[in-house]
Curated annotation (Swiss-Prot):
GO terms for molecular function: NAD+-diphthamide ADP-ribosyltransferase activity; toxin activity. It comes from Corynephage beta. NAD(+) binds at residues 46, 90. The keyword Disulfide bond applies. This diphtheria toxin homolog is a nontoxic cross-reacting material (CRM) produced by a strain of corynephage beta that had undergone N-methyl-N'-nitro-N-nitrosoguanidine mutagenesis. This treatment induces guanine-adenine transitions in the DNA; the differences from the wild-type sequence at positions 104, 187, 222, 456 and 532 can be explained by such mutations. Either of the first 2 mutations will completely abolish all ADP-ribosylating activity of fragment A. The last 2 mutations may be responsible for the reduced receptor-binding capacity of this protein. In wild-type active diphtheria toxin, fragment A catalyzes the ADP-ribosylation of elongation factor 2 and blocks protein synthesis in eukaryotic cells; fragment B binds to the receptor protein and is necessary for the movement of fragment A into the cell. Disulfide bonds join 211-226, 486-496. This is Diphtheria toxin homolog CRM228.
């Protein structure tokens, strides 16, 4: 053996050539090296619910009960993001969203070096397999072990996983191991809780800053993108206008003509259309007259139908508080245009027009309530609706002013009732079984012309074998992630509704991310599942004198 060859073998042995694969071998399919990094004093942001503002500032602790960050055992952890405005969106109390309250945003920082490991996929089974981890132990528990940190930490004291916050968004979501998260120092960034029932208003005002640098979706000019509105002023002006409207002679007379619950829906809409036209003659709403020509939503028939539908939902004994607001507000196609009224007010006082539009909307809904038997004082009903419509205005306005992105359909879109829906990729349309773990499926949704609502989604399930991961199922609109409220119905179907109103069309696209969890490796056969399609429900329409939601069905395939 030559000296040169011996030296080469010796160097190869010292460098590990011929030894077992390195920590990163096989990881390229799940790890994005270009977005992974090591940082000293790594910081991120976390949104906290009302009631936990004081406790979180004392340090991060794993909750003893609840979801502990996620329903899926693999993904239980402390969640944060690089965008403080996105973090603010998690400060609302989901159990009592109509309280008006919000918590806070905190900045959390690790001491020393932290490795951020960026993932390309969110399928825990695939990640564990490609990284050579145990397939039976929860992913995030393994991330906190010394072995994992030694293999993937590049000399750092800990490893934090990262995933895109939502499709179309440049923000990132960080998943921290609970034990590792105890080392985080906590600093208050902004406190919404001190505003009481106005906390959510402060939160939305704060979040509006997030899109300050994005180009406006509409063509009226960039100066209207993310307008800095004073919501307290708008609320006060709105309530003043409502009182003025109620005492106005013609409006007062029209209110006295309000039909009762027994009147036909057609007569009810006719009355509300007349009421709408009468209200527009009020001098306090003079600015709106100059905008009506470019905003079709001010057609009386639209307002009338909207008000009737809102009233019917409010009157329902089975609807919960969330459904009585967000569901009601997303019934009528085109109602999203109300939120874009400021875009038609180029030469006017935008804040004034916003207040006027909310006042008129509130009065219409309050006047519709008696039509279905809800005996509520008109002022009280209108004031409560002010809270809801302001929140709706903010949510949709912020969504519309985010940069639009190409839907990137890779399968033929299904066109129906003005909507266009498709699977993102062929792989998304396949539900694979025969393994424990989770899979994500993306659906692209848009509308051909007028903005249309996405009211809810119906997902087929097999309890105990194929369940919906409620915490990871969401919908994103132009990069803004909106969580969904899901509940099981009829045992084998899960019903999910966006927690904030969602509209698509006119350049606005939505990405629905459905996450399924398999607690068993048992194979699933197609005849076991109640339906072979996912249903997307849109606006309400009347078919054979019966109200139904527009429904789009996307068929999937079961494979083992």
């Amino acid at each position: 053996m030559s000296r040169k060859l011996f030296a080469s073998i010796l160097i190869g042995a010292l460098l590990g050539i011929g030894a077992p694969p390195s920590a990163h071998a096989g990881a390229d399919d799940v790890v994005d090296s270009s977005k992974s990094f090591v940082m000293e004093n790594f910081s991120s942001y976390h949104g906290t619910k009302p009631g936990y503002v004081d406790s979180i500032q004392k340090g991060i602790q794993k909750p003893k009960s609840g979801t502990q960050g996620n329903y899926d055992d693999d993904w239980k952890g402390f969640y944060s993001t690089d965008n403080k405005y996105d973090a603010a969106g998690y400060s609302v109390d989901n159990e009592n969203p109509l309280s008006g309250k919000a918590g806070d945003v905190v900045k959390v920082t690790y001491p020393g070096l932290t490795k951020v490991l960026a993932l390309k996929v969110d399928n825990a089974e695939t990640i564990k397999k490609e990284l050579g981890l145990s397939l039976t132990e929860p992913l995030m528990e393994q991330v906190g072990t010394e072995e994992f940190i030694k293999r993937f930490g590049d000399g750092a004291s800990r490893v934090v996983l990262s995933l895109p916050f939502a499709e179309g968004s440049s923000s990132v979501e960080y998943i921290n191991n609970w034990e590792q998260a105890k080392a985080l120092s906590v600093k208050l960034e902004i406190n919404f809780e001190t505003r009481g029932k106005r906390g959510q208003d402060a939160m939305y005002e704060y979040m509006a800053q997030a899109c300050a640098g994005n180009r406006v979706r509409r063509s009226v000019g960039g100066s209207l993108s993310c307008i800095n509105l004073d919501w307290d002023v708008i609320r006060d002006k709105t309530k003043t206008k409502i009182e003025s409207l109620k005492e106005h002679g013609p409006i007062k007379n029209k209110m006295s003509e309000s039909p009762n619950k027994t009147v036909s829906e057609e007569k009810a809409k006719q009355y509300l259309e007349e009421f709408h036209q009468t209200a527009l003659e009020h001098p306090e709403l003079s600015e709106l007259k100059t905008v009506t020509g470019t905003n079709r939503v001010f057609a009386g028939a639209n307002y009338a139908a909207w008000a009737v539908n809102v009233a019917q939902v409010i009157d329902s004994e089975t609807a919960d508080n969330l459904e009585k607001t967000t569901a009601a507000l997303s019934i009528l196609p085109g109602i999203g245009s109300v939120m874009g009224i400021a875009d038609g007010a180029v030469h006017h006082n935008t804040e004034e027009i916003v207040a006027q539009s909310i006042a008129l909307s509130s009065l219409m809904v309050a006047q519709a309530i008696p039509l279905v038997g809800e005996l509520v004082d008109i002022g009280f009903a209108a004031y409560n609706f002010v809270e809801s419509i302001i929140n709706l205005f903010q949510v949709v306005h912020n969504s519309y002013n985010r940069s639009a992105y190409s839907p990137g359909h890779k399968t033929q879109p299904f066109l129906h009732d003005g909507y266009a829906v498709s699977w993102n990729t062929v792989e998304d349309s396949i539900i694979r079984t025969g393994f424990q773990g989770e899979s994500g499926h993306d659906i692209k949704i848009t509308a051909e012309n007028t903005p249309l609502p996405i009211a809810s989604v119906l997902l087929p399930t097999i309890p105990g074998k194929l369940d919906v991961n409620k915490s990871k199922t969401h919908i994103s609109v132009n990069g803004r992630k909106i969580r969904m409220r899901c509940r099981a119905i009829d045992g084998d179907v899960t019903f999910c509704r966006p927690k904030s109103p969602v509209y698509v069309g006119n350049g606005v696209h939505a990405n629905l991310h459905v996450a399924f969890h398999r607690s068993s490796s048992e194979k699933i056969h197609s005849n076991e599942i109640s339906s072979d399609s996912i249903g997307v429900l849109g606006y309400q329409k009347t078919v054979d004198h019966t109200k139904v939601n527009s429904k789009l069905s996307l068929f999937f395939e079961i494979k083992s």
